[in-house]
């Protein structure tokens, strides 16, 4: 089975998710499913990889295609089994019908059709749309310790509770949240664009950027509370930007809990120290 996806995979795990779902639905082994990402020679439609929608939206198309495959082979196999079409069932692994000893898998059904020259059963296409967008929800809690003498802010605990609806692959979803939260935490604490007095950009490479470091990111506690999305036949929500979107707000709220009412990101030690000094001086007046 070949699947053409109009979004490029940049580490999101599209290959695992998009192949895993039709494998479960069709009974085919995942290693028999090949995925092509943003190949304009095969698929003229597509868009950018952004927002939490690759699996939640695009997995509906393979589902529709698998449903069409099942319907097409049900009609074909009914004739082979000598039974009425409406008694043929597909249980996720094999086709079967009362009164027949034939129990072919999807792959075996394809081979039977090929042997009879039924090339019309070798290719199936379907379109699927959604009445509404992906609507993920969740909460992020940041617990920090601030050293007022140095302005150093340490992230000691970070907890996430997310509702992504039904999950195809829990490990992949948790990886999205972990990576996004790590990027969001470092963006909040250190990452910034720096210009000199003449307006020349100084942070021109990764050597000058504060990239996330494992030593600065605590173990992130992730809990999922799935509520199936009614607008999606699969009940799925997106998860792509949940970690990165929640982290800056959670950390900013934690910093403000120290009595700091206004400070711009990133919350560098020098910036936090200056604000705490101003707060202390204002309290003494």
Where are these regions (language model features)?
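Cofactor-binding beta-sheet edge motifs in enzyme active sites
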Residues: 1-285
């Amino acid at each position: 089975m070949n699947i053409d996806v109009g979004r490029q995979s940049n580490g999101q795990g599209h290959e695992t998710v998009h192949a895993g779902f039709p494998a479960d639905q069709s009974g085919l082994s995942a290693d028999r499913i090949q995925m092509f990402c943003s190949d304009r020679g095969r698929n003229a439609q597509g868009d950018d990889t952004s927002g939490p929608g690759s699996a939640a939206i695009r997995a509906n198309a393979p589902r529709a295609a698998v449903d069409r495959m099942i319907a097409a082979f049900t009609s074909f196999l009914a004739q082979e089994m000598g039974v009425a079409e409406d008694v043929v069932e597909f249980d996720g692994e094999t086709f079967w019908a009362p009164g027949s000893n034939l129990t072919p898998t999807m792959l075996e059904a394809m081979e039977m059709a090929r042997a009879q020259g039924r090339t019309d059963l070798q290719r199936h296409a379907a379109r699927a749309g959604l009445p509404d967008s992906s609507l993920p929800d969740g909460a992020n809690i940041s617990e920090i310790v601030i050293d007022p003498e140095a302005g150093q802010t340490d992230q000691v605990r970070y907890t996430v509770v997310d509702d992504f609806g039904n999950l195809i692959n829990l490990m992949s979803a948790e990886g999205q949240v972990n990576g996004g939260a790590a990027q969001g935490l470092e963006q909040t604490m250190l990452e910034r664009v720096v210009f000199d007095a003449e307006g020349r950009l100084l942070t021109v490479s990764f050597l000058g950027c504060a990239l996330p470091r494992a030593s600065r990111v605590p173990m992130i506690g992730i809990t999922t509370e799935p509520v199936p999305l009614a607008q999606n036949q699969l009940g799925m929500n997106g998860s792509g930007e949940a970690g990165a979107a929640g982290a800056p707000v959670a950390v900013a709220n934690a910093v403000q809990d120290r009595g700091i009412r206004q400070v711009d990101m990133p919350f560098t030690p020098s910036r936090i120290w200056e604000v705490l000094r101003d707060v202390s001086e204002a309290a003494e007046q």
